[in-house]
Structures are given as structure tokens and as C-alpha cells.
Swiss-Prot record:
Signal peptide start and end residues: none
Keyword set, alphabetical order: Cytoplasm, Endonuclease, Hydrolase, Magnesium, Metal-binding, Nuclease
Amino-acid positions noted as binding a divalent metal cation in the UniProt annotation, renumbered to this chain: D97, E98, D202
UniProt cross-references to Gene3D superfamilies, sorted A to Z: Ribonuclease H-like superfamily/Ribonuclease H, TATA-Binding Protein
Protein family membership: Belongs to the RNase HII family. RnhC subfamily.
Catalytic activity: Endonucleolytic cleavage to 5'-phosphomonoester
Enzyme class, spelled out: hydrolase
Full protein name: Ribonuclease HIII
Length: 308
């Protein structure tokens, strides 16, 4: 079970020490100021103001101190090998997220968005939250309301460019890292001289891997950057970025459908194979590759359907 570590200020550390007093463990490891054990989780606070949570309930327990969002029935966010400051959910943060990576049709779309504490009540009122359960019409409605309010940058990797990069040996993780880094850099430029308190990336790769992907970039954003899975639940900036990214993805998807004259399906299942085969039959393989991620297995499946 991976550890979850958070960084807190001194008053919070003292508060945690008092809160966990009924569960205290008298045996302290080196550098610790308190240790406690609750069902499913061991908590250790250190002089460095780092607090480590270990056990099956570690992430859930840590989230009580990291964010003020209510617990959901889904798996708790994972702060993978990273440290989120205390009260992170109320800080001024640039968040970034992407969509379209698992869809055969359509571009990879990345958005970075800045949300400060003053804007949070309005964004919540406008419906900004974890968007995974939202339908496209709701996404579009909310995105159109928040885009004028939230400094953001959206970058798309069109399918022809995606296929070109993929043939040159670049994997999807590398493409996403480049897009995230550049989108975040764009928002930082828009904000200057204002600086965010942190940057949170919805994690798709380990931190070291992410920065290895960026090794040849002339400008790499490293300062105050954090990575977490399910980051939409950790800060509204990521939730806003996800909504805007999906809105732009839907727009691109609709434009492609009109251009090819066929409603294009999302995902990469058998229903996608059938539409891909129809496009090959009507317009040829070259047209299909213009709208798709060519290396997906759907290409070969569609070709087999055409040959039958």
C-alpha cells in the first residue's frame, strides 16, 4: 500500500496531534512529534511538518486535512509520490487535465485553468465539479459560462499531427506531457506578474517520467508542481480545466462529424469499428486516418470488416 504524505503548517500539525491523541502510539520514529493508529490507517507527524498516512484508509484520512470536499463513494484521490499543502482546495491554483486519449476519433485536448479563492463560490454556483458523470450538453452549458471568468489555455493535438508524432516514435504520454507543460506555461504568462500558489496536474505518469518526457523542451515548468490522480476532486481548477477541455473536444468532434458527413462515435469499442469501416468503404483509408488515432486496433478491425 503506497504512503500518502501531506505538508502542513505548524498550527495544523498541533491540531492534528490533539485530534489523534485518543489514538496515539507512544513509540515515535526518529523525527516524529506524534504517531497514531486508527482502523485501517497509521498516522505519523514529523518535525518537518510532513504527515504520513499508511494503510488502506490512508488516502481517505489524508483527504480530511488536504481538502474540504465531501467524501464520494468513488476511490479517493491518490497523491502519487507527492506532497499537497494543507488546505490545498482553498489555494490559488493552476489545474490541468486532458480528454480524448482513449477515443479512436478526435484530438487529444488539454486545458490548464487558473482558479483563485475569490472565484470558487461563483464557479461552484455555476456547477463546476467533477465532470465525469456530466453529459455533453451540461458540459457545454457550464463551459460557456466559466470560460470568460477563468484564465485558461486549451491545446489540441489534431489527428494528423498525432499520427505523425506516433510514427516518429513518440508515445501518448510524451504528447500529453508536452501539451500540459505548454498549456500551463501559457496560463502563467497570462497571469504574470501574479503567480499561483501551486500547479496541479491530473496524473497520467509518474513525476520522473513526466519530466523525462519534457527533457528536450526549452522551457519546463517545475516550480510548485504537484501530481495527483482524480485531481478534479482536489481542486476546482482541475475540475474547471476538465470541463473546458471536454467542451473543446466536443466542438472538435462535432466539426469532424459534419466534415465527414457521418456522426462519429466516442470511445474505441465495436460500435466505433463499424463507423470506421463505413468511412473506409465510402471515402478510403486515407480519409479515416485524418480523423483517427491510426495505431489503435480499431483501424485493423475496420479494415477486416471491409474485406469481408
Amino acid at each position: 500500500m503506497a504512503n500518502t504524505v501531506i505538508l502542513v503548517d505548524q498550527p495544523t500539525l498541533e491540531k492534528m496531534k490533539q485530534t489523534y491523541l485518543p489514538f496515539s502510539n507512544p513509540k515515535l520514529p526518529p523525527g516524529a512529534v506524534f504517531a497514531a493508529k486508527k482502523p485501517g490507517v497509521s498516522i505519523t507527524g514529523y518535525k518537518s511538518r510532513k504527515v504520513m498516512f499508511q494503510g488502506v484508509n490512508g488516502e481517505v484520512e489524508a483527504k480530511k486535512w488536504v481538502a474540504t470536499l465531501p467524501e464520494s463513494k468513488t476511490k479517493a484521490p491518490s497523491v502519487s509520490k507527492g506532497i499537497l499543502p494543507a488546505n490545498f482546495a482553498s489555494k490559488n491554483v493552476i489545474g490541468s487535465d486532458e480528454v480524448g486519449t482513449g477515443d479512436f476519433f478526435g484530438p487529444i485536448t488539454v486545458c490548464a485553468a487558473y482558479v483563485d479563492a475569490e472565484m470558487m463560490p461563483l464557479l461552484k454556483e455555476l456547477g463546476v465539479k467533477d465532470s465525469k458523470a456530466m453529459k455533453d450538453p451540461e458540459i457545454c452549458r457550464i463551459a460557456e459560462k466559466i470560460m470568460p471568468l477563468v484564465p485558461h489555455s486549451v491545446l489540441l493535438c489534431p489527428n494528423p499531427k498525432y499520427n505523425e508524432l506516433q510514427k516518429r516514435g513518440m508515445n501518448q504520454g510524451q504528447m500529453k506531457a508536452l501539451l500540459h507543460n505548454r498549456a500551463i506555461e501559457n496560463v502563467l504568462k497570462k497571469l504574470a506578474p501574479v503567480k499561483p500558489e501551486a500547479i496541479l496536474i491530473d496524473q497520467f505518469a509518474e513525476k520522473n517520467t513526466y519530466y523525462r518526457y519534457l527533457a528536450k523542451e526549452p522551457s519546463i515548468i517545475r516550480e510548485d508542481v504537484f501530481f495527483a490522480t482524480k485531481a478534479e476532486g482536489l481542486h476546482l481548477s482541475v475540475a474547471a480545466a476538465s470541463i473546458i477541455a471536454r467542451y473543446k473536444f466536443v466542438q472538435a468532434f462535432d466539426a469532424m462529424s459534419k466534415e465527414v458527413g457521418i456522426p462519429l462515435p466516442k470511445g474505441a469499442g465495436p460500435h466505433v469499428d463499424a463507423v470506421a469501416a463505413e468511412i473506409i468503404e465510402r471515402f478510403g483509408l486515407e480519409t479515416l486516418t485524418k480523423y483517427t488515432k491510426q495505431h489503435f486496433a480499431n483501424t485493423e478491425k475496420a479494415l477486416k470488416m471491409v474485406k469481408k
